């Protein structure tokens, strides 16, 4: 006889948290100093197979220390923003961490390279007005700290004209190497 008997029962598969994963590495970024950075970490950078598990984001330097003062990270929009200055030229390594609802994390690092751009020299210390008596020799050295340039390795060259851009009077010369004005004005130059 082919008699059978059966019973039914349920098997419940309990969900356990799966750690989020790195799906797509974050691309390195480059920016010129004094330029505004705005970079959004792509939404598909990290993945989590757990249904209804949302990720939250944080960013630090790769060693866990805070981002430099010029750089901020919006944890809601995943946007890095800021304007690096001359002092920030070079590369930093940034770590972005995604955390799921069960506090499991995954991280990725990427570099932000700040390229140097030429900065104009600036007037650091105004040149004091000078006076000389007619028929007396003038010798005045423009102080070395009169002008400044924040660009490392830049050296300044000097030239002198009248304030309207025209040439110096014939009695006055300027040595561009030593920054020395010299000459003897006559009565006609008063």
Task: Give the location of each predicted region.
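Acidic active-site catalytic centers that drive phospho-/nucleotidyl reactions
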Residues: 48, 74, 100, 149-151, ...
């Amino acid at each position: 006889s082919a008699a059978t008997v059966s019973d039914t029962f349920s098997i419940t598969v309990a969900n356990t948290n799966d750690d989020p994963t790195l799906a797509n590495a974050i691309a390195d970024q480059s920016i010129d100093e004094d330029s505004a950075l705005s970079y959004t970490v792509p939404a598909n950078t990290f993945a989590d197979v757990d249904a209804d598990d949302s990720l939250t984001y944080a960013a630090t330097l790769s060693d866990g220390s805070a981002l430099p003062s010029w750089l901020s990270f919006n944890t809601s929009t995943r946007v890095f923003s800021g304007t690096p200055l001359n002092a920030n030229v070079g590369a930093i390594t940034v770590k972005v961490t995604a955390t799921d609802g069960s506090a499991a994390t995954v991280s990725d690092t990427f570099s932000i390279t700040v390229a140097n751009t030429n900065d104009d020299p600036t007037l650091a210390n105004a040149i004091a007005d000078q006076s000389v008596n007619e028929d007396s020799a003038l010798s005045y050295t423009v102080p070395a700290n009169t002008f400044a340039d924040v660009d490392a390795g830049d050296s300044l060259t000097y030239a002198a004209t009248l304030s309207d851009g025209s040439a110096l009077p014939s009695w006055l010369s300027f040595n561009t190497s030593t920054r020395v004005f010299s000459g003897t004005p006559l009565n006609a130059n008063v």
